[in-house]
Amino acid sequence: MSERVVLAYSGGLDTSVAISWIGKETGAEVVAVAIDLGQGGEDMNVVRQRALDCGAVESIVIDARDEFAEQYCLPTIQANALYMGQYPLVSAISRPLIVKHLVEAAKFHGADTVAHGCTGKGNDQVRFEVGIGALAPDLNVIAPVRDYAWTREKAIAFAEENKLPINVTKKSPFSIDQNVWGRAVETGFLEDLWNAPTKDVYDYTADPTVNFEAPDELIITFDKGVPVAIDGRPVSVLEAIVELNHRAGRQGVGRLDMVEDRLVGIKSREIYEAPGAITLITAHQALEHVTIERELGRYKRQVEQRWGELAYDGLWFSPLKRALDAFVQDTQQHVSGDIRMVLHGGSAVVNGRRSEQSLYDFNLATYDEGDTFDQSLAKGFVQIHGLSSKVAARRDLNQK
């Protein structure tokens, strides 16, 4: 059997050209692996056939939607992970899943080389290659777009010269990546930071300033940090994301326009749509505020930031990430209950919380009759709490 290369295949121009190019340049057979992450668009059977038509000896489509939701999106919810306080890691958390299946396919087909279509300016090259190195350190990696400085024009010329069945007549001005967790848009006129996004940038969300529908009130139920029901109806994690993408997206929830610090050292403007992700993370945070003790909550917020950075930086399979996963999972033991939210005008606003695991004690919190808080203890507490500051202040005043 000839040497084989396993390619992470998207169905787009670059990876379609890569199939033929790898065969011609290396003499290897190409096995194309396409992952269904709920990205929509083309039928995956069409994508599979295109890979074969471009010269792949085998073309595999893997339905990983539930796996993505349960093993990648759910940990992101439980970690309340928002890179730079905003971005719910739409693309970042999909890459380790693709890497996992790429490595498994390489082992199954006896390949010692894998390939991807990432450029040299983005984060994904790091996510792919660091992830591959963590799971299969002996695998070789080919990155033709990066290593041979492919441009769109070069790729089109190669496709035409080799009569590859790729339709390249219509060119979007944007680079788009999407899955069930959200949608990322960049490049084109968006590279000028002063240019406002036009309506054609968006697809997952309605314009909240124009499409002012009636508010949508809903209740999300969590069990140990897992969303298990919407409005009392049981749902899987995937079903929760899909339903909230529709309901929150219709209200314009989840639009982000940010300048992002890329791992490779440059700043990049990104437009994100993540209605389901933002709604679920907002609800989960609200329930944690009710059910997690103060010091644990404070420390978890530090962990959340680092967790998001590790996921963004391609270190999903790192020892530190695994350790933080264990910490986050332990914090979820009491994160059970209901969160009521109103979706409207681009916002997901929490307006109700209830939980049998709640640490909120009405009788301690109330200022009305029935107050059980012993205020006689407060004076001594205040004095002890501020004692070190008072001692330091006396020293400083005496030295003036």
From Swiss-Prot:
Cell compartments where the protein resides: Cytoplasm
GO terms for biological process, alphabetical: argininosuccinate metabolic process; L-arginine biosynthetic process; urea cycle
Top-level taxon of the source organism: Bacteria
Binding of L-citrulline, residues: 87, 123, 127, 175, 260, 272
The UniProt record lists the keyword ATP-binding: yes
Gene Ontology terms, MF aspect: argininosuccinate synthase activity; ATP binding
Keyword Transferase carried by entry: no
Residues bound to ATP: 8-16, 117
UniProt keyword terms in alphabetical order: Amino-acid biosynthesis, Arginine biosynthesis, ATP-binding, Cytoplasm, Ligase, Nucleotide-binding
Name of the protein described by the UniProt record: Argininosuccinate synthase
